[in-house]
Amino acid sequence: MKLLSKIMIIALATSMLQACNGPGGMNKQGTGTLLGGAGGALLGSQFGKGTGQLVGVGVGALLGAVLGGQIGAGMDEQDRRLAELTSQRALETAPSGSNVEWRNPDNGNYGYVTPNKTYRNSTGQYCREYTQTVVIGGKQQKAYGNACRQPDGQWQVVN
């Protein structure tokens, strides 16, 4: 199953957990911790075999939960929407090495996506390496990844 599909399942499961939490749902930090932990476990499972893979899952879940909680504590839904739209635009149109910025005027949070190397994967899809930087409450955090262009024109994170 592709990584983005797994992420969508995790997001759906998190939404369901929030619904079970009663009126108001879970706070942003709780959501970030859940998503970060699940995403970290998913990423950690991509490395090693046997016991090494289990260690990767555990370490990934722990680091993802910590980072996700920190980011989620400050990012709201508008921040996430702006970051996603900017990511799609940057990966599709921006030259390698250029920053494409988003900014939430309501809370001052901002970030940028820097697309880097463009390449074709084994199935012929165009893919790009990228760096995503977010500044939440004055604290900067970076993430690195790869995304591939889907037939519908959307970019899908692959790791």
From Swiss-Prot:
GO terms for cellular component: cell outer membrane. The keyword DNA damage does not apply. It is found in: Cell outer membrane. A lipid is attached at C20 (N-palmitoyl cysteine). Keywords: Cell outer membrane, Lipoprotein, Membrane, Palmitate, Signal. Residues 1-19 form the signal peptide. InterPro entries: Anti_2, Gly_zipper_2TM_dom, Surface_antigen_Rickettsia. It is a lipid-anchor. A lipid is attached at C20 (S-diacylglycerol cysteine). Its main location: membrane. Coiled coil: none annotated. It holds the Pfam family 17kDa_Anti_2. Belongs to the rickettsiale 17 kDa surface antigen family. This is 17 kDa surface antigen. It comes from Rickettsia japonica (strain ATCC VR-1363 / YH). The lineage of its organism: Bacteria, Pseudomonadati, Pseudomonadota, Alphaproteobacteria, Rickettsiales.
